[in-house]
Amino acid sequence: RARAHNATRGAAQGGSTSQPVTPLAGLEHGHTLDERFDGNSPKTFPGANNGEDWKVRNFGDHDWGNVDLTEATAQSVNTAYAELNLEVGPEKTADVAARLGIKADVGVNLANVLGDATVTPLELTNAYATIAAQGMKATPHIVASVTDSRGNLVYEAPGADKRTQEFDPEVMAAATYALSQVVETGSGKPAQAIGRPAAGKTGTSTDNKSAWFAGFTPGLATVVGLYQSGPNGEQEQITPFGKWVDSEITGGSWPVEAWTSYMQTAAANLPAGEFPDYTPPKPKPTETPTETPPEPPTEEPTPELSHREVAQAPRRAHR
């Protein structure tokens, strides 16, 4: 049977683990975590897909109502993320993915926010490590260097000591906060068991052919990916097992529990650390119409608004 290094060569659709790329692009271009979007499902974007309608669904067709970007991240609200990608532009999402270290071909199309690209665990780990390092990107390597018994350097991984500041730390602080809410309130809750600050994202591809949890503490990033191959090597729906035998395998099932179990040991002797200081914006109130009290009767006629005054009259926000 052929052998392969699944960490570096095993690839599958990233699903929602790729979603944080779009908020990063948005944060770089003036968007904020308190912006609100329609999180109901399904949602149709007329003409958005090369002139054709684009229909997006949430997992289980769940209606989340009006959500901000923090909740959209915590709950993997596809419809909210799709609207954000429409505003930000899929080309900016693809650019951020490349700068994070994702070498896969992230297409310049609106669906790239939903994680349709095929990625390796190494690529995702590099991306989440860059977020954990507050925008400082490193070159992935397995062995940094080798010296012989005389202390002579016989091997050094290309770029092993190279670090580049790819992103503004303030942008990464906001992204880290949003991802920490996946663990606090979302599908990554099992990761709370490591007993130290944690952030990350669950991901499940179409038809449950792959399931992921990508996460980090202040000092360590780890990715768990799970997929199932058929007799001819093709990826197929993951067969439920263990305590999930009567349900389905998603990123919030075995992957996050495996991640938590591993991290409890791997991070045990590392300083707990803290995520960067970040004060989340106060939620914006939802606008509601109010009635204007009637004017008292007057004998003088009310002057008509000019065309310019009508154009400048306040209007209710559409969202």
Question: Where are the model-predicted features located?
Answer:
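Short active-site loop at a secondary-structure junction
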Residues: 1-21, 29, 33-41, 67, ...
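Extracellular glycan-interaction surfaces
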Residues: 24
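Short polybasic/polar patches that bind polyanions
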Residues: 27, 86, 98, 132
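Secondary-structure transition/capping motifs at alpha-helix termini
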Residues: 27-35, 103-105, 133-138, 231
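Conserved catalytic neighborhood of penicillin-recognizing serine enzymes
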Residues: 31-93, 109, 137, 149-181
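Mid-domain, small-residue-enriched loop/turn segments at the edges of structured enzyme/sensor domains
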Residues: 51-57, 89-126
